[in-house]
Amino acid sequence: MIQELDLAPGERARFISDVHFGHAKALAREPEELAFLLEGCTHLVVCGDLSETRESPCQAEGLEKRARFLQMCRDAGVQPVLLAGNHDPDEKAGLLKLQGGRVCALHGHALFKEVAPWG
């Protein structure tokens, strides 16, 4: 699915990807470590793999931290825009068209299926 987003004057989007909440090797262990990303933006575009939502030993932890992070976004008045990655394939949108298609965003596995055939 393609999601579209048009920012109004004064709105700002920030882009991140591959946070991997719940994974043992994630650089950010707790959602609160990423609170600084919510400053100065109205939308946070996550280009895949916010957390480990596929069935795995770290799924429960990933889902819990994902929920906490999304609540942090809402509390800060930031609208999260979630795109599917190969570790969170259940997200609805796989591609974001921003500003009428002048900017597009997606997770890398969407272009190169061979790097993540399970995604």
Residues of each region from the PLM?
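Active-site-proximal loop/helix segment associated with metal-binding centers of metalloenzymes
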Residues: G108-G119
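Core catalytic region of metal-dependent phosphoesterases/phosphodiesterases
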Residues: I2-G101
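Histidine-centered catalytic micro-motifs
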Residues: V19, A105-H109
